[in-house]
């Protein structure tokens, strides 16, 4: 049996063996975060993410979500691919300047992080049980009403940046978070000081100005929300601002000075899959549903489905068409779009029609 004072360092060691980069411990009193959460919901900043409102304050009350919870273990797992080069932020910005290249958010180019983290959090829980005996617990990673970023902040994983993501002096923000709710009391780890200062680069760079104030994001304007969570037509006013981003957006992270310290993952799971990096928009637009399912198997992109995939690419093709001054390129882009002009999906047809009109 491991005594409680020795347990957290032991957990940190076991976690490193499983590919986690940092472990923290938080208490369960998140009442100070409740007013901000309710105000954000009241302003409608969650958009169509109705599950955010449905669970209300339960998100800020771990012991209501999982009765008996008295401590929360937070876990950080870095996700930059193992082959990430020096100066990777500049490389990604350069790719954004190539209008016909499809841009998928870095985190989504590899294996679905839900599967990776959940399995390893459970292994960590099993390892703890071997040392202390059976205990009540439940593991989470972006999959339940959990205030992940707030728990991470309180447990010393980092501070909340003005883009609302958690920032670490040692790892920037290019990491996933996971939690273990447990019925065992552990000493909390200390929070860290914020280090954004007067910098607001993330606010300035956001293509759609979704960061409406420091620490305040209107999801309805966020490209990640629009390309992933939003099911219907993308607001026409926002389409030209999306550029060639077809799944997610990393701009607020790419510009952040702290991400020069972002760490490559120790796991192969997050290495980029060839079809999702450096591909041309027209190539991906040609995928039928069977090809889409095959190419996205085991990854996070599959969850949006083929229809939204085509919707997103149609917008990007329209932006590429508007940007080109080459008649040959314009003809090829129009030809690619024309293949879906009579698509079975009204959603796809509408976005294709918009895209074709960008070349007029």
UniProtKB/Swiss-Prot annotation:
Query: Pfam families, from UniProt?
Result: Fer4_16, QueG_DUF1730
List cofactor names only.
cob(II)alamin; [4Fe-4S] cluster
Gene, per the UniProt record: queG
Q: Where does [4Fe-4S] cluster 1 bind?
A: 196, 199, 202, 256
Molecular function GO terms recorded: 4 iron, 4 sulfur cluster binding; epoxyqueuosine reductase activity; metal ion binding
Q: Which residues cross the membrane?
A: none
Q: In which pathway does it act?
A: tRNA modification; tRNA-queuosine biosynthesis
Quaternary structure? Monomer.
What positions does the domain 4Fe-4S ferredoxin-type occupy? 187-216
- Function per UniProt: Catalyzes the conversion of epoxyqueuosine (oQ) to queuosine (Q), which is a hypermodified base found in the wobble positions of tRNA(Asp), tRNA(Asn), tRNA(His) and tRNA(Tyr).
Q: Does the keyword Oxidoreductase apply?
A: yes
Q: What are the EC numbers?
A: 1.17.99.6
| This protein's UniProt keywords | 4Fe-4S, Cytoplasm, Iron, Iron-sulfur, Metal-binding, Oxidoreductase, Queuosine biosynthesis, tRNA processing
Supply the HAMAP family for this chain: QueG (MF_00916)
Annotated protein name in UniProt: Epoxyqueuosine reductase
Active site residues per record: 142 (proton donor)
* Reaction catalysed by this enzyme: epoxyqueuosine(34) in tRNA + AH2 = queuosine(34) in tRNA + A + H2O
Annotated residues that bind [4Fe-4S] cluster 2 are located at: 206, 222, 249, 252
Q: InterPro entries this protein is in?
A: 4Fe4S_Fe-S-bd, 4Fe4S_Fe_S_CS, QueG, QueG_DUF1730
Origin species: Alicycliphilus denitrificans (strain DSM 14773 / CIP 107495 / K601)
Q: Where in the cell?
A: Cytoplasm
């Amino acid at each position: 049996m491991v005594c409680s004072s020795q347990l957290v360092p032991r957990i940190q060691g076991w976690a490193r063996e499983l590919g986690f980069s940092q472990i923290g411990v938080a208490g369960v009193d998140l009442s100070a975060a409740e007013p901000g959460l309710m105000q954000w919901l009241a302003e409608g900043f969650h958009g169509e993410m109705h599950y955010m409102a449905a669970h209300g304050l339960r998100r800020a009350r771990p012991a209501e979500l999982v009765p008996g919870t008295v401590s929360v273990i937070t876990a950080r797992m870095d996700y930059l691919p193992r082959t990430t080069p020096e100066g990777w932020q500049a490389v990604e910005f350069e790719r954004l300047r190539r209008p016909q290249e499809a841009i998928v958010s870095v985190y989504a180019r590899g294996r679905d992080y839900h599967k990776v983290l959940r399995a390893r959090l459970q292994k960590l829980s099993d390892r703890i049980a071997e040392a202390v005996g059976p205990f009540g617990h439940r593991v989470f990673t972006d999959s339940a009403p959990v205030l992940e970023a707030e728990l991470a902040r309180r447990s010393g994983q980092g501070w909340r940046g003005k883009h609302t993501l958690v920032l670490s002096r040692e790892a920037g923000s290019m990491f996933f978070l996971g939690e273990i709710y447990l019925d065992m009391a552990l000493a909390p780890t200390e929070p860290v000081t914020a280090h954004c200062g007067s910098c607001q680069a993330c606010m300035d760079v956001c293509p759609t100005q979704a960061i409406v104030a420091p620490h305040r994001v209107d999801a309805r304007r966020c490209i990640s929300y629009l390309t992933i969570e939003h099911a219907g037509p993308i607001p026409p006013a926002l389409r030209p601002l999306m550029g060639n981003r077809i799944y997610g957006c990393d701009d607020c992270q790419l510009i952040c000075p702290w991400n020069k310290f972002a760490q490559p993952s120790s796991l192969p799971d997050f290495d980029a899959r060839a079809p999702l990096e450096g591909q041309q928009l027209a190539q991906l637009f040609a995928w039928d549903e069977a090809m889409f399912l095959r190419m996205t198997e085991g990854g996070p992109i599959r969850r949006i489905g083929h229809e939204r995939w085509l919707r997103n690419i149609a917008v990007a093709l329209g932006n590429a068409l508007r940007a080109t001054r080459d008649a040959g390129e314009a003809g090829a882009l129009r030809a690619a779009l024309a293949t879906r002009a009579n698509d079975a999906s009204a959603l796809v047809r509408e976005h294709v029609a918009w895209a074709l009109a960008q070349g007029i």
